[in-house]
């Protein structure tokens, strides 16, 4: 990185400062590139239940320390009402329906690249920036969303529902870097967040147990745990606490006739409030050949008059999977070349053409893989 004075630019950029190292380095890099840089810390959750779980205060202090260090102004904004209406209520509704949602995807679409973008433009910004590990490319009059260069940190999965017009107004400085480089830059420039641990999990839950958090908002409905043969072998405390492919926390044990293989969640019978389980990590009912997706968001319009061969992820960090995507009367159907394990309704499937993230949608149903005739 050159230490020479940057050429001043006229564009004013407001960086979403989370109090983490990625957004900190993003602000620094943009400043070095000559942009007029300011920061903005957004509060998306009201801490009515105390501060022991939520790190917002600490994060704000870290963001302020970084802004002071590099000499930029830090704005603050409260988007808690927008978050509740556009993200959290949907999150609760999905769990109530027995599905497993991903609120981070909706948060990016509705808060970071909508509420924050609108607020930044109101403040007079030309562009916003975030610390996401993605890239953008302007091509043929549209802006594409590309995977981040670091395959271990690529976050395009979480940004697939953000439109090209919003991507065009956004910069992603660390998307061109690998994580160790980002930390090295932060350390070299004495940023307070250089060694700060990456945040994990859902932001509004923090470090508390997920079941304890959910109980505050949704009443638990206990029911039976059944095998695929219909035998009741236990009780669950609520379908919403379980997800497809889950092994831990089922409380099944001591069944003499069952053998030693661990039990896994295979499905949920919502009408009967029954959790369906089976033994073995490779149980056939854990694998799907196809899925149906709805609520599709494309970064840019995608032509699907006929089936199209693409690659897809059905969860974050999964390697890209070959599939054929077609539009149907009920949504979009993706048929995979290889069996897909633990395809989970409520989670997102995201489609790629090479390094370009095209968009994705919410998984509605999965079709079981027919292992007949296969080795």
UniProtKB/Swiss-Prot annotation:
Keywords: ATP-binding, Cytoplasm, Disulfide bond, Nucleotide-binding, RNA-binding, Transferase, tRNA processing, tRNA-binding. GO terms for cellular component: cytoplasm. Its main location: cytoplasm. Residues 153-155, 315-316 are annotated as: Interaction with tRNA. Disulfide bonds join 107-203. Gene3D superfamilies: Adenine nucleotide alpha hydrolases-like domains (2.30.30.280), HUPs (3.40.50.620), Translation factors (2.40.30.10). ATP binds at residues 16-23, 42, 131. This is tRNA-specific 2-thiouridylase MnmA. CDD domains: MnmA_TRMU-like. It catalyses: S-sulfanyl-L-cysteinyl-[protein] + uridine(34) in tRNA + AH2 + ATP = 2-thiouridine(34) in tRNA + L-cysteinyl-[protein] + A + AMP + diphosphate + H(+). Belongs to the MnmA/TRMU family. It comes from the Bacteria. GO terms for molecular function: ATP binding; tRNA binding; tRNA-uridine 2-sulfurtransferase activity. Pfam families: tRNA_Me_trans, tRNA_Me_trans_C, tRNA_Me_trans_M. InterPro entries: MnmA-like (IPR004506), MnmA-like_C (IPR046885), MnmA-like_central (IPR046884), MnmA-like_central_sf (IPR023382), Rossmann-like_a/b/a_fold (IPR014729). Its EC number is 2.8.1.13. Residues 102-104 are annotated as: Interaction with target base in tRNA. GO terms for biological process: tRNA wobble position uridine thiolation. The active site is at 107 (nucleophile), 203 (cysteine persulfide intermediate). It is found in: Cytoplasm. Catalyzes the 2-thiolation of uridine at the wobble position (U34) of tRNA, leading to the formation of s(2)U34.
